[in-house]
Amino acid sequence: MYKIQLLSCIALTLILVTNSAPASSSTKETQQQLEQLLLDLRLLLNGVNNPENPKLSRMLTFKFYVPKKATELTHLQCLVEELKPLEEVLYLAQSKNFHLNHIKELMSNINVTVLKLKGSETRFTCNYDDETATIVEFLNKWITFCQSIFSTLT
């Protein structure tokens, strides 16, 4: 009788351990999503930081909040909170090389990818740095964050 209970207990423990361990496919999926987010952020940065962009100096006057220390995927909530102001400033960057439709598509991609990466958790409270960042600094910080997380996964 005790053998059956012991075997059941072992089986349940193995199931719990197996289900709670991260699957390699989820790591691969996270890497792919981070690559996509990196690509989209770089495209935004290139559109903004283009020397031919006559509105760059005006865009640099807008300030964005960045977290004091972003080290985990949950910190992407801080990016989510700044996406709307970012999008509004990006509309200023519209030019013949950086169209409104392209900006909307990139912002939509970023929103979707960030939600996949951070999950639906919204209770995370961002601890922002005292100093604000320009749009270029803001995008560079998030690019660096993605690269850092990506390097820990490889």
UniProtKB/Swiss-Prot annotation:
It is found in: Secreted. GO terms for biological process: activated T cell proliferation; adaptive immune response; cell surface receptor signaling pathway via STAT; extrinsic apoptotic signaling pathway in absence of ligand; interleukin-2-mediated signaling pathway; leukocyte activation involved in immune response; negative regulation of B cell apoptotic process; negative regulation of inflammatory response. InterPro entries: 4_helix_cytokine-like_core, IL-2, IL-2_CS. It comes from the Eukaryota. Residues 1-20 form the signal peptide. Its main location: secreted. Glycans are attached at residue 111. Keywords: Adaptive immunity, Cytokine, Disulfide bond, Glycoprotein, Growth factor, Immunity, Secreted, Signal. GO terms for cellular component: extracellular space. Disulfide bonds join 78-126. Pfam families: IL2. GO terms for molecular function: cytokine activity; growth factor activity; interleukin-2 receptor binding. Belongs to the IL-2 family. Cytokine produced by activated CD4-positive helper T-cells and to a lesser extend activated CD8-positive T-cells and natural killer (NK) cells that plays pivotal roles in the immune response and tolerance. Binds to a receptor complex composed of either the high-affinity trimeric IL-2R (IL2RA/CD25, IL2RB/CD122 and IL2RG/CD132) or the low-affinity dimeric IL-2R (IL2RB and IL2RG). Interaction with the receptor leads to oligomerization and conformation changes in the IL-2R subunits resulting in downstream signaling starting with phosphorylation of JAK1 and JAK3. This is Interleukin-2. It comes from Felis catus.
